[in-house]
Curated annotation (Swiss-Prot):
One of its GO terms (molecular function) is NAD binding. It is an enzyme of class 1 (oxidoreductase). This is Glycerol-3-phosphate dehydrogenase [NAD(P)+]. Its EC number is 1.1.1.94. The gene is gpsA. GO terms for biological process: carbohydrate metabolic process; glycerol-3-phosphate biosynthetic process; glycerol-3-phosphate catabolic process; glycerophospholipid metabolic process; phospholipid biosynthetic process.
């Protein structure tokens, strides 16, 4: 099977490496091919591209029916507008909400391909590239297309589960980033694992409230794309969102160019009428209207209520 992977950041490179090793005919498109020095992505150091993986900066070389779009959510609309790619199926690998339109990734990709899907779930690029066991969700409104993608994109170490709840899968991946920022801040401030556990539980309740209000199914949020991804990113410094929250609490900075999707999502939620106290606090903390002590006080001073 031919497969195009658009975007040579950490996740795109990880997927391209995994699928090339699994025997697929993979073409990896990079915006800056010259930056891929030494046969690897600078965003995923130590993981060399296998023989047979085609790397290009020319979109016209990407002719597969299925394209995995592994670019940040905030870059998707601009990429689609430029044209040059016309797959039959465009699979988003981004986890966010577009700040200009408020749309999820698959809605942005609808102008690119007649069929869209969302690949999401608990996964770090390095684990995928190393061939470590990973389970993901492939969400597609068309059940037959979803099943076909599941069969085509599952490997001995990468297991895919299907759902038709695209909204739930997209929002699970986007919202958990916000909670991961908060979890990073909790650990960076030295508040302990008990506080982090409480945050994860209340954060999951916040995710579920928001997502179901937008039409998601509750059971989707309890699956890989919601709870599974939340547990992973709130518990590991491999998560960029977790590291960002940690840096907010300690006064450190992340490397220039680090993508933090959860920051944009937090701002979207803070501007919405939904009850999202954790997202509101993360947005205020990131924007400097609250410091870490003020953020903690803000959350702990909320009215007591039943769980």
């Amino acid at each position: 099977m031919k497969l195009d992977v658009i975007g040579a950041g950490a996740f795109g490179a990880g997927l391209a490496i995994a699928y090339a090793r699994a025997g697929l005919d993979v073409t990896l498109w990079a915006r800056d091919v010259a930056g891929l020095r030494g046969g690897e992505s600078p965003r995923l150091p130590g993981h060399a591209f296998p023989d047979g993986l085609h790397v290009t900066g020319d979109l016209s070389a990407c002719t597969a029916d299925v394209a995995l779009i592994a670019i940040p959510t905030q870059s998707i609309a601009g990429f689609v507008a430029k044209g040059g790619l016309a797959p039959r199926v465009a699979v988003s690998c981004a986890k966010g909400i577009d700040r200009s339109s408020g749309h999820g990734p698959t809605a942005l990709l609808a102008a690119l391909a007649p069929c869209t899907a969302q690949l999401t779930g608990p996964s770090f690029a390095a684990d995928i590239a190393r061939g470590l066991p990973t389970a993901l969700t492939i969400a597609c409104a068309d059940a037959a297309e979803g099943a076909a993608l599941q069969n085509a994109l599952s490997t001995p170490t990468l297991r895919l589960y299907t759902t038709q709840d695209v909204i739930g899968a997209e929002l699970g991946g986007a919202l958990k980033n916000v909670i991961a920022i908060a979890a990073g801040a909790v650990i960076g401030k030295g508040l302990g694992d008990s506080a982090r556990a409480a945050l994860i539980a209340r954060g999951f309740a916040e995710m579920t409230r928001y997502a179901t209000a937008k039409g998601a199914l509750p059971e989707t949020l309890t699956g890989l794309s919601g709870l599974g991804d939340l547990i992973l990113t709130c518990g590991s410094a491999q998560s960029r969102n977790f590291r960002f929250g940690h840096a907010l609490a300690t006064g450190d900075r992340l490397p220039e160019g680090t993508t933090v999707e959860g920051l944009h999502t937090a701002r979207q939620l803070a501007a919405s009428p939904e009850d999202t106290p954790i997202a509101d606090t993360v947005a205020a903390l990131a924007d400097g209207t609250l410091d870490i002590d003020g953020a903690l006080s803000h959350l702990l001073s909320r009215p007591l209520k039943p769980e």
